[in-house]
């Protein structure tokens, strides 16, 4: 170009002016109006080579004499491998609000069809990092847990209420869920994991209203001899107020959770919403559907099973079985055989041999034993000692929690499904260099995993593109970054292999790579939160911030060597390499050259200037003009390129090398500066190593930086996960206070008293004994967020039974019972519903708490039921389930024993106060006899 006196712009103009189609207007020939079209669009690459280029000085040349015209792709800035083999990756991102599972199914079908019809045999398409897999498994686990919980709840109800009544009550679950499903679409709710868990949590609570109504109907119908219609009306009316109040108190704790702020609140908002809808639906079912079922089907005695009825039932069961076999729908036949078998088993063995003896012998014995316990507890001053004993237990449990309590975390940590090894080389490192380092990391990871590891599904390596956090996908190319992703098989297929151990093995194997930042991490199982360790240093002067940052790093990692810190990584990039072109403005002005001219000339030489687009069929390809590769990698060679411009004085074209007016200075600069609240901020972040507690590690860091002397106007603050945890703890504490206030208002309205609601609400405080003792004894990790939600939810569940018990005791007193007898009889009559509602809630949560999984679809299709303990959902939701199980188990004892004792204490205190006022009035009357006249 320089020798012949041409510039890149000359070539660009020439190619652009030739590759055009121009409409010349309409022309009339032989009476026909035709559009005059000048067609000059290139049809092959040779035409580009033969374009004539005219220079500013009148010189002429072909493009082929000035440049090499080649068909090529963009410069490779990213690399990808799957299990060591080169691959091309295609990331498919789901639109917001669309069904993930449906999208995954459609993609899988399209890929399978394309594989068969379009691809050669030696080319395969593999779907990796399929997020729908985890979603399917979690949903299946939770749905199976719902079924197991429903079965357990129905079984326990059968013993207390009989099979028919248990089925009436059990129907409350699907009916309430159905009503909730009708409402959810109007709220734009999707069926996600949180929604599924909300339904699981509601299983045991849903049946509470139905248990109280049906049990009361059954008692009046069978024991009092009242006809079924009258018994149904009386039973529903008798418990209407306490049931409605109980439902409202159960709902009360969930209302504050609707206003949970931030991303965590957006994640959990489905939980209180679905529970409020479902529990409201359960109230409708209990008072509209269940009474109808009771009137139609409830009998004092089992119906006589005559031959005709038995033949009819057997005929239906046999027909369904044959239908299932003929149509190939095995599950229809299996369900038909199961239902027929259960019907016969119940008629001839379960009810007469198991349930009837339990109801006639064991349950009355249990009731008499309970009456004896109550009679003993409220004799003399024993009630005071019972309550005092519970208070001492509470104080002792809190002390034990402080001294020997379990670990506390923000969110529970589950066994990882993915392990990520993030590789970061110095800013400016070429993609090929980063790829060579990534290969070393990949080889070491493969060595640790071993060949054909049954726990590992795939190993994927990315360099440049797709090397960032999968939770925050960034499609920009970062040549200095790489990532190795290890995908593990589903939890049920790991056979006890703890995948978390691989993270430690990877860290140990990759410590010795010099000049490279290696971070080993796993996927986030909950809502998005900040880094486990996140230290923000804020101030005005950047150099001072850097100095403080370096002191903090040395203090924590070298001096104190605080355990658990993986690697403190700064978000401030200080060594971003830069080649700065400095223009001599005096020389440039003398030559008539502007800064823009120099800048655009360099940019076009490096990145290329698009002259035109070349069309091949339906595809368009940009025609880029830029200098050869060897020159693009040499800054001095680039500066020797000529600048072609017209001299204003003479009007002649001139060429001046850029080096005549500019020079290159090699330096480093900051990659970017963050600001927060108008102050510059530098952040140090790190993961916490396996086996270390995040809160304990952060406490050590907090104490360490508190003693660090820093200049005035500068601040060191722990943010990230710690800040989120503090905000969550404060919100849940506030939500608990609001919930208790709502519960108090509801109960004061019902009882028209303050003393009795406070009496019942003490069970909320005492139920913490069960929660804390459970976590201490079994050394379970306490989650601030998940356990906190459980404790808030527990508040409403606990007071429900207390309301039913106290309300019925008041009813008996109004009927003329003395207080002591009313307490004993009220407790005995309400013993069944109290135990049943507690047992239903506990058993409904047990499958999730222990992680019991049975694949019922596989079971009814006579395939492997895949029975196993543990799952990803258990690790996350388990603390919530256990907090309710522990708390409610202890609260049931409180309701049955301690609440009657406190009721008796309240009565004796009120009685003494009345006697005291009466004696005072009598004394005043004796001393002042004229006062009555």
Name every feature range the model reports, one short phrase each.
Residues 128, 135, 139, 214, ...:
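Helix-loop junctions and hydrophobic alpha-helical segments within the transmembrane domains
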Residues 151-219, 259, 277, 742-830, ...:
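Hydrophobic transmembrane alpha-helices and their membrane-interface caps
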């Amino acid at each position: 170009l320089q020798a012949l006196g041409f510039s890149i712009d000359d070539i660009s103009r020439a190619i652009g002016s030739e590759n055009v189609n121009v409409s010349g207007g309409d022309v009339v020939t032989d009476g026909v109006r035709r559009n005059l079209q000048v067609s000059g669009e290139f049809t092959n690459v040779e035409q580009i080579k033969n374009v004539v280029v005219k220079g500013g000085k009148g010189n002429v040349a072909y493009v082929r004499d000035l440049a090499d015209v080649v068909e090529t792709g963009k410069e490779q800035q990213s690399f990808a491998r799957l299990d060591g083999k080169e691959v091309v990756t295609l990331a498919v991102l789901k639109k917001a609000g669309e069904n993930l599972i449906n999208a995954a199914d459609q993609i899988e079908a399209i890929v399978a069809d394309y594989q068969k019809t379009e691809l050669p045999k030696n080319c395969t398409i593999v779907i990796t990092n399929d997020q729908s897999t985890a979603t399917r498994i979690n949903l299946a686990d939770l749905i199976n847990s719902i079924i197991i919980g429903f079965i357990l709840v129905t079984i326990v109800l059968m013993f207390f209420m009989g099979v028919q009544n248990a089925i009436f009550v059990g129907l409350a679950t699907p009916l309430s869920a159905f009503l909730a499903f009708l409402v959810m679409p109007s709220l734009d709710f999707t069926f996600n994991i949180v929604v599924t868990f909300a339904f699981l949590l509601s299983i045991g609570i849903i049946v509470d209203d139905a248990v109280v109504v049906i049990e009361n109907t059954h008692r009046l119908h069978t024991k009092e001899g009242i006809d079924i219609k009258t018994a149904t009306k009386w039973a529903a009316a008798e418990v209407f107020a306490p049931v409605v109040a109980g439902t409202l108190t159960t709902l009360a704790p969930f209302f504050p959770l609707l206003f949970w702020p931030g991303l965590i609140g957006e994640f959990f908002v489905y939980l209180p919403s679905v529970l409020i809808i479902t529990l409201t639906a359960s109230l409708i079912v209990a008072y509209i559907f269940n009474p109808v079922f009771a009137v139609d089907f409830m009998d004092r005695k089992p119906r006589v099973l005559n031959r005709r009825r038995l033949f009819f039932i057997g005929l239906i069961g046999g027909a369904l079985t044959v239908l299932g076999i003929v149509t190939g729908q095995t599950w229809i036949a299996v369900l038909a055989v199961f239902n027929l078998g259960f019907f016969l088993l119940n008629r001839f063995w379960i009810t007469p041999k198991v349930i009837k003896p339990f109801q006639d012998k064991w349950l009355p014995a249990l009731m008499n034993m309970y009456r004896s316990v109550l009679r003993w507890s409220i004799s003399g001053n024993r009630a005071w000692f019972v309550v005092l004993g519970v208070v001492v237990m509470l104080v002792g449990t809190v002390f034990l929690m402080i001294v020997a309590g379990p670990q506390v975390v923000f969110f529970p940590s589950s066994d990882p499904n993915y392990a990520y090894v993030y590789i970061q080389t110095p800013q400016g490192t070429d993609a090929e260099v980063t790829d060579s380092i990534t290969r070393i990391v990949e080889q070491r990871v493969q060595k640790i995993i071993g060949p054909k590891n049954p726990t590992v599904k795939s190993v994927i390596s990315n360099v440049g593109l797709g090397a960032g956090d999968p939770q925050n996908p960034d499609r920009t190319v970062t040549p200095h970054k790489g990532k190795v992703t290890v995908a593990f098989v589903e939890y049920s297929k790991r056979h006890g292999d703890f995948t978390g151990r691989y993270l430690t093995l990877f860290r140990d194997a990759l410590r010795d790579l010099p000049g490279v930042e290696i971070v080993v991490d796993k996927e986030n199982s909950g809502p998005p939160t900040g880094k486990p360790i996140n230290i923000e240093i804020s101030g005005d002067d950047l150099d001072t911030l850097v100095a403080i940052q370096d002191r903090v790093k040395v203090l924590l990692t070298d001096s104190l060597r605080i355990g658990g810190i993986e690697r403190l990584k700064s978000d401030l990039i200080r060594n971003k390499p830069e080649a700065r072109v400095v223009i001599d403005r005096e020389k440039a002005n003398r030559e008539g050259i502007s800064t823009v001219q120099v800048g655009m000339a360099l940019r076009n030489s490096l990145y290329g200037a698009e002259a035109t687009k070349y069309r091949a069929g339906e595809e368009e390809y940009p025609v880029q003009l830029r200098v050869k590769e060897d020159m693009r990698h040499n800054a001095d060679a680039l500066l020797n390129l000529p600048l072609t411009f017209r001299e204003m004085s003479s009007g002649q074209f001139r060429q001046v090398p850029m080096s005549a007016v500019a020079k290159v200075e090699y330096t480093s600069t900051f990659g970017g500066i963050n600001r927060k609240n108008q102050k510059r901020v530098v952040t140090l972040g790190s993961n916490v190593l396996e086996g270390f507690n995040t809160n304990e590690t952060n406490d050590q860091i907090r104490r360490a930086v508190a003693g660090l002397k820093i200049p005035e106007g500068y601040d060191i603050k722990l943010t990230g996960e710690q800040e989120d945890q503090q905000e969550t703890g404060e919100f849940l504490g506030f939500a608990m206070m609001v919930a208790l206030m709502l519960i108090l208002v509801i109960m004061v309205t019902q009882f028209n008293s303050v003393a009795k609601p406070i009496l019942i609400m003490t069970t909320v405080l005492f139920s913490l004994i069960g929660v804390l003792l459970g976590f201490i004894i079994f050394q379970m990790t306490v989650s601030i967020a998940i356990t906190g939600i459980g404790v808030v939810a527990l508040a409403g569940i606990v007071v429900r039974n207390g309301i039913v018990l106290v309300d019925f005791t008041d009813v008996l007193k109004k009927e003329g019972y003395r207080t002591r007898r009313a307490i004993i009889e009220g407790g005995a009559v309400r013993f069944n519903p109290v135990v049943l509602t507690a047992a239903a809630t506990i058993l409904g949560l047990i499958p999730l708490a222990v992680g019991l999984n049975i694949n019922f679809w596989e079971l009814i299709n006579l395939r492997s039921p895949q029975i196993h303990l543990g799952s990803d959902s258990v690790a996350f939701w388990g603390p919530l389930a256990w907090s309710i199980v522990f708390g409610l188990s202890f609260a049931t004892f409180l309701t049955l024993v301690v609440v009657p004792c406190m009721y008796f204490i309240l009565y004796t205190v009120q009685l003494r106060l009345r006697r005291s006022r009466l004696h005072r009035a009598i004394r005043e009357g004796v001393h002042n006899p004229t006062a009555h006249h």
